[in-house]
């Protein structure tokens, strides 16, 4: 009969692959805590970035307003043309 497998004592070091895995997880965790996501822009330059973004959005809004006015005017022109054609179709050709 074979002797029972030797149990590791609670204080014995873990096997090397497990040790490497734990070490790599600890290093990754420390790195993730050291570099929080979204902090690439220094605090001093954030107001400037925000100002540029605000100006860009204002220009985009002005462009959208111009486009909306242009589309509105074009729609009105097309509706008037359609009404004129409908009215002209109602009149007899001889008059």
From Swiss-Prot:
Signal peptide: 1-34
Biological process, per Gene Ontology: 3'-UTR-mediated mRNA stabilization; spermatogenesis
UniProt record similarity statement: Belongs to the NICOL family.
Function: mRNA-binding protein which interacts with a range of target mRNAs including SERPINE1, ACTA2, CCN2 and COL4A1 and may promote extracellular matrix production. Binds to the 3'-UTR of SERPINE1 mRNA and stabilizes the mRNA, possibly by competing for binding with SERBP1 and preventing SERBP1-mediated mRNA degradation. Also binds to the 3'-UTR of ACTA2. Testis-derived lumicrine factor that triggers epididymal differentiation and sperm maturation.
Complex formation: Interacts with NELL2; triggers epididymal differentiation. Interacts with cell surface receptor TFRC; the interaction mediates uptake of NICOL1 into fibroblasts.
PANTHER family the UniProt entry points to: NEUROPEPTIDE-LIKE PROTEIN C4ORF48
Keywords per UniProt: Cytoplasm, RNA-binding, Secreted, Signal
Localization, UniProt: Secreted; Cytoplasm, Perinuclear region
Tissue/organ expression: Detected in the brain (at protein level). Also expressed at low levels in the kidney, primarily in tubular epithelial cells.
The UniProt record lists the keyword Nucleus: no
InterPro entries: NICOL
Pfam families per UniProt: Neuropep_like (PF15161)
Miscellaneous notes: Up-regulated in the kidneys and serum of patients with diabetic nephropathy and enhances renal fibrosis so may have promise as a biomarker of renal fibrosis and as a therapeutic agent for chronic kidney disease.
GO molecular function: mRNA 3'-UTR binding; transferrin receptor binding
Name used for this protein in its record: NELL2-interacting cell ontogeny regulator 1
Superkingdom, natural source: Eukaryota
GO cellular component, one term: extracellular space
């Amino acid at each position: 009969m074979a002797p029972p497998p030797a149990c590791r004592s609670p204080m014995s070091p873990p096997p090397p692959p497990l040790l490497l895995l734990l070490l790599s997880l600890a290093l990754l965790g420390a790195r993730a805590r050291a570099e929080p996501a979204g902090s690439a822009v220094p605090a001093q330059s954030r107001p400037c970035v925000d100002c540029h973004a605000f100006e860009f959005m204002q220009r985009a809004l002005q462009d959208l307003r111009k486009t909306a006015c242009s589309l509105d005017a074009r729609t009105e022109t097309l509706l008037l043309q359609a009404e004129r054609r409908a009215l002209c179709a109602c009149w007899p050709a001889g008059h």
